[in-house]
C-alpha cells in the first residue's frame, strides 16, 4: 500500500530530494532578533522626540510670562502717566489717555487710592498700586534724574546733586582699589607659595594698600617668619617694587633653611686667607649671599696699597714712580725690603755730555773713565756680595738679573742698577738726595735710564793686596795709544765716582757683542764642614775682578739685594720670595764687606794723600779666593812696610819674576798661574811675583801688570781654585802679561774679549788664592795713594 504526501501541507515531512539544513533556522532566528532590537530602538527614539516636543511647547509659556511682566511694567508706567495727568489738572487728557491705553476705570474713582481690581475678558490687566505724591511720582523722579545727569555730564546741577555725585565717585574708586589689591595679594601669595616661603599668612588687601601708601597702621599679617621685617616696607617678592638699593641679607634661620653669612675678610696683601664672596664649602640654597658692604682700596698694616681686586704677594711692595713704558717691570721678589734709597741723578743727552767733557778738561777726561763692578756668579751655590758702607746703616745685597740669553742692549751692562761699590774715605752719597722712586722701581728700569751726571768730587780709596794679572783681547802687537776713547755703541756713565756692581747670570754675547764674565771654577759645598786652618781655609772659590766691556750706569749703594746664582738653570735667586733660582736653600752671609774711612772733604783728602783702606771679606763657608782689580795709574804700597815709595822704570830694568817650583809650573797644566815661557816679561808691561813685592819697599807701577803665585797661610796651594791668565781673541796663546785695555778687561778662564777700543793706562791686579782664615782678614792689605774710586774700573767676582 503506498501513501502519497501532499506538498501543500507544511507539516508534512519533506521529501528526501530536499535535504534539511540547520543553518537556515539559525539565520531566521538572528533576523527575528535584529528586528526586535530595531523596534525597541525606534520606540526609544520616538519617546525622545516626544519629550523634545514637549520641551519646545513649554518654552513659549516661559516667554509669555516675560512678556506679561513687560506688559505689566508698561502698564505700570501708563498708570504713573495717568496719575501725573490727573494731578496736573489734565482730566480730559487723562480720560483720553486711559481710553487709548485700555485703562477702563470707573468714572469718579480716584486711582490714587490704589488700583481697582475688575474682572475682564483678558484685555484688561490689574493695576498696581501707584505711589501717592503731591505732584506725581513721575515728576519727582524726573527732577532727580535730570539733576544728576547734568552733574555727571558737567552741565551744572544743584549743590545736593554734586555732593551726591562725589560720594558715588569715591565709593566707586575705593571699590576699584580694593578689587585691584585683592588681585595683587593673590599674586603675591601665589609667588610665595611657589618659592616655598608661604606660611599661611592672611594678607588684607586694605592693609597692604596702607603700607604702600605709607600710612601708619598695624601689621597686615602676624609675624610668623623670622626673616620678615616688622617695618612696613614693600614685600620682597613684589615684581613691581623689588628693586633694592642694597643686596638682601638673610639671617641664619634653621627653620627657614637660610644659610649663615660669613663676615667679609679685611683687605690685605696676602690673599691666602681670603675666600670668595660666597662660601662654596656650604650648599647655599635660596637667595644669594652677599658680603656687604664692599670696602674700597685701603692700606695694609705695613703700608701696602691693596684692594680686593689685586693680588700682592709681598709685604713691602710699592709701585714704581714714573716707570718707563719700554722697560720690563721688576719682579716683586727682587725689590729690597726697608732699604733707604738715594735719588736718581738727572740724565742728560749725549750732546750735553760732550760739552761738559770739553769744559772739564784733562781732569774731567780722566775721571770720565767708566767705573763698573761686575759680579759674575759662575759656581754652584755661590752667593753675590753684600756691600756695606760705614756711612749707611743698612747692608744691601746685590741685585740679581733674571735674563738668561740675548738680553736687550739696555739691560746688558746695566741689568740691575740698584747696586754700587764705594772706594773712598767718606760716604759720597751723604750729600746726595734720596729718591723715593728708587725704592720700588725695577733695577732694570733704573739701569736703562740715561747716563747720570758727572761727580765733581773725588775720593781716595784703597783695596786689599792681591797678585796682579793683565790680559788683552788684542794680540801682542797691538799699538798703544795715549788717547782715551770709550767703546762704541755704549753709553757713558755721568756719575764717574760711583762704580756699580752688576750681577751676570750667563756668559753669552748679545747683539752688541757685550762680554760677560764667567767662571769655570767649581765652588765647594756650602753645607759641608767648615774649613780648617790646615786644609784649604780660603773663604770662597776663584773670583775674577776684571773689567767689563760696556760702561755701567752708576747707581746708589743703598738699593742692593743679596742673591744666589744657579749655573744649571742660568738664573739668579733673590733673598725674598719665589725667585728665579733653583736652589732656594742657600743663605750665605755677605761675601763682600767694603769699609771706608770717616766722611770728609774729598778734595782735601785727595790733596793730603791719606791712604784709604778697603777690606774685602768673604762669606762663611768659602775656601778660596781669586780676585782681579783693574787699576789706573796709582801708587801701590804694601801694608807690610811703610817705606818711601820708589818708582820703577817703565822698561829695561825689571824685576825677575819669581815662580815657585811646583806642579803648577808645567806648561801642560791648564790651571797653572805661570809657565816657564811666561816667566820673562815682554813689552813695556812688566811682570812681578807678588811674593817678591810682599816685603819690598813701596813701588810705583805707572803702567805695569803683576802676577802672583800666592799660597795659603799654611803653604797649601789650591791649584783647583786658581785661574790662569785670560785668553785673548787673537792668535796668541795664553799670556801672563799683555798690554792693558781701555777698560782693563780681565776675563775668566776660557773667555775672549771683543772690545775694539782700549786704553793703555789701566792696570790689572790679580789677587789669586788669597790666604784667608775664617773670621779673619786677608794676608795682604793694599794701601793706595793718589787714587780714588775712578781708578777702579771693574770688579769681577767669580764664584
Swiss-Prot record:
Residues 354-370, 482-497 have a biased composition (Basic residues). Belongs to the FLO8 family. Transmembrane segments: none annotated. Changing residue 598 to P: In strain: Diastaticus / ATCC 60715 / YIY2-11A. InterPro entries: LisH. Residues 73-105 form the LisH domain. One of its GO terms (molecular function) is DNA-binding transcription activator activity, RNA polymerase II-specific. The keyword Transcription regulation applies. This is Transcriptional activator FLO8. It comes from Saccharomyces cerevisiae (strain ATCC 204508 / S288c). It is found in: Nucleus. Required for diploid filamentous growth, haploid invasive growth and flocculation. Putative transcriptional activator of FLO1. Changing residue 441 to T: In strain: Diastaticus / ATCC 60715 / YIY2-11A. Residues 1-20, 37-68, 101-127, 255-406, 431-503, 568-622, 644-691, 705-758 are annotated as: Disordered. Residues 41-55, 307-317, 341-353 have a biased composition (Low complexity). Changing residue 112 to I: In strain: Diastaticus / ATCC 60715 / YIY2-11A. The keyword Transmembrane does not apply. Its main location: nucleus. GO terms for biological process: positive regulation of cell adhesion involved in single-species biofilm formation; positive regulation of flocculation; positive regulation of invasive growth in response to glucose limitation; positive regulation of pseudohyphal growth; positive regulation of starch catabolic process; positive regulation of transcription by RNA polymerase II. Residues 1-10, 270-285, 318-340, 371-396, 460-480, 584-593, 660-675 have a biased composition (Polar residues). GO terms for cellular component: cytoplasm; nucleus. Keywords: Activator, Nucleus, Transcription, Transcription regulation. It comes from the Eukaryota.
Amino acid at each position: 500500500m503506498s501513501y502519497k504526501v501532499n506538498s501543500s501541507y507544511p507539516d508534512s515531512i519533506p521529501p528526501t530530494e530536499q535535504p534539511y539544513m540547520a543553518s537556515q533556522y539559525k539565520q531566521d532566528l538572528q533576523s527575528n532578533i535584529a528586528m526586535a532590537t530595531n523596534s525597541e530602538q525606534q520606540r526609544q527614539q520616538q519617546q525622545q522626540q516626544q519629550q523634545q516636543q514637549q520641551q519646545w511647547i513649554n518654552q513659549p509659556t516661559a516667554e509669555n510670562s516675560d512678556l506679561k511682566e513687560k506688559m505689566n511694567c508698561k502698564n505700570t508706567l501708563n498708570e504713573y502717566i495717568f496719575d501725573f495727568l490727573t494731578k496736573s489738572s489734565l482730566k480730559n487728557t487723562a480720560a483720553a489717555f486711559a481710553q487709548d491705553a485700555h485703562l477702563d476705570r470707573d468714572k469718579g474713582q480716584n486711582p490714587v487710592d490704589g488700583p481697582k481690581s475688575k474682572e475682564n475678558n483678558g484685555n484688561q490687566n490689574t493695576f498696581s498700586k501707584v505711589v501717592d505724591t503731591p505732584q506725581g511720582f513721575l515728576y519727582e523722579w524726573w527732577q532727580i534724574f535730570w539733576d544728576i545727569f547734568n552733574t555727571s555730564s558737567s552741565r551744572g546741577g544743584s549743590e545736593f546733586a554734586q555732593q551726591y555725585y562725589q560720594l558715588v565717585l569715591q565709593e566707586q574708586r575705593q571699590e576699584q582699589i580694593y578689587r585691584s589689591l585683592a588681585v595683587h595679594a593673590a599674586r603675591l601669595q601665589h609667588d610665595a607659595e611657589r618659592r616655598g616661603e608661604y606660611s599661611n599668612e592672611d594678607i588684607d588687601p586694605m592693609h597692604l594698600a596702607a603700607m604702600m601708601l605709607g600710612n601708619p597702621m598695624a601689621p597686615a599679617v602676624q609675624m610668623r617668619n623670622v626673616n620678615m621685617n616688622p617695618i612696613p616696607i614693600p614685600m620682597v617678592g613684589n615684581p613691581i617694587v623689588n628693586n633694592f638699593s642694597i643686596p638682601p641679607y638673610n639671617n641664619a634661620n634653621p627653620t627657614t633653611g637660610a644659610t649663615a653669612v660669613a663676615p667679609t675678610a679685611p683687605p690685605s696683601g696676602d690673599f691666602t686667607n681670603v675666600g670668595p664672596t660666597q662660601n662654596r664649602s656650604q650648599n647655599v640654597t635660596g637667595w644669594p649671599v652677599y658680603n656687604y658692604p664692599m670696602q674700597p682700596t685701603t692700606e695694609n698694616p705695613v703700608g701696602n696699597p691693596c684692594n680686593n681686586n689685586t693680588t700682592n704677594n709681598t709685604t713691602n711692595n710699592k709701585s714704581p714712580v714714573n716707570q718707563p713704558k719700554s722697560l720690563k717691570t721688576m719682579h716683586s721678589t727682587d725689590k729690597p725690603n726697608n732699604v733707604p734709597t738715594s735719588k736718581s741723578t738727572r740724565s742728560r743727552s749725549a750732546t750735553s755730555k760732550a760739552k761738559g767733557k770739553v769744559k772739564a778738561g784733562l781732569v774731567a777726561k780722566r775721571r770720565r773713565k767708566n767705573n763698573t763692578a761686575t759680579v759674575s756668579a759662575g759656581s754652584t751655590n755661590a752667593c753675590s756680595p753684600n756691600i756695606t758702607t760705614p756711612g749707611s746703616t743698612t747692608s744691601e745685597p746685590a741685585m740679581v738679573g733674571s735674563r738668561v740669553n740675548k738680553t736687550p742692549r739696555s739691560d746688558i751692562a746695566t741689568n740691575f742698577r740698584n747696586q754700587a761699590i764705594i772706594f773712598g774715605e767718606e760716604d759720597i752719597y751723604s750729600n746726595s738726595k734720596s729718591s723715593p722712586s728708587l725704592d720700588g722701581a725695577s733695577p732694570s728700569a733704573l739701569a736703562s735710564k740715561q747716563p747720570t751726571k758727572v761727580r765733581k768730587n773725588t775720593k781716595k780709596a784703597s783695596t786689599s793686596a792681591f797678585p796682579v794679572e793683565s790680559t788683552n783681547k788684542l794680540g801682542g802687537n797691538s799699538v798703544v795709544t795715549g788717547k782715551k776713547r770709550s767703546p762704541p755703541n755704549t753709553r757713558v756713565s755721568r756719575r764717574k765716582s760711583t762704580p756699580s756692581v752688576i750681577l751676570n747670570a750667563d756668559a753669552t754675547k748679545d747683539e752688541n757683542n757685550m762680554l760677560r764674565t764667567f767662571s769655570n771654577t767649581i765652588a765647594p759645598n756650602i753645607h759641608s764642614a767648615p774649613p780648617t786652618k790646615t786644609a784649604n781655609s780660603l773663604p770662597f772659590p776663584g773670583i775674577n775682578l776684571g773689567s767689563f766691556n760696556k760702561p755701567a750706569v752708576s747707581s746708589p749703594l743703598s738699593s742692593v739685594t743679596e742673591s744666589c746664582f744657579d749655573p744649571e738653570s742660568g738664573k739668579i735667586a733673590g733673598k725674598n720670595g719665589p725667585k728665579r733660582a733653583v736652589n732656594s736653600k742657600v743663605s750665605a752671609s755677605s761675601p763682600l764687606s767694603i769699609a771706608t774711612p770717616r766722611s770728609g772733604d774729598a778734595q782735601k783728602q785727595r790733596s793730603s794723600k791719606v791712604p784709604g783702606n778697603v777690606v774685602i771679606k768673604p762669606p762663611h763657608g768659602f775656601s778660596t779666593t781669586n780676585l782681579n782689580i783693574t787699576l789706573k795709574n796709582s801708587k801701590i804700597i804694601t801694608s807690610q812696610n811703610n817705606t818711601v815709595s820708589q818708582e820703577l822704570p817703565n822698561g829695561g830694568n825689571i824685576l825677575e819674576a819669581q815662580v815657585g817650583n811646583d806642579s803648577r809650573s808645567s806648561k801642560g797644566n791648564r790651571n797653572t798661574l805661570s809657565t816657564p815661557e811666561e816667566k820673562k816679561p815682554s813689552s813695556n808691561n812688566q811682570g812681578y811675583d807678588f811674593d817678591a813685592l810682599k816685603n819690598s819697599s813701596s813701588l810705583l807701577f805707572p803702567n805695569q801688570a803683576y802676577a802672583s803665585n800666592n799660597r795659603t797661610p799654611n803653604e797649601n796651594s789650591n791649584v783647583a781654585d786658581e785661574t790662569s791668565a785670560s785668553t785673548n781673541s787673537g792668535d796668541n796663546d795664553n799670556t801672563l802679561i799683555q798690554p792693558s785695555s781701555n777698560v782693563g778687561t780681565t776675563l775668566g778662564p776660557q773667555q775672549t774679549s771683543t772690545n775694539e777700543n782700549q786704553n793703555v793706562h789701566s792696570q790689572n791686579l790679580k789677587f789669586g788664592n788669597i790666604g784667608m782664615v775664617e773670621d779673619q782678614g786677608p794676608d795682604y792689605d793694599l794701601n793706595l795713594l793718589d787714587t780714588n774710586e775712578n781708578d777702579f774700573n771693574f770688579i769681577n767676582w767669580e764664584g
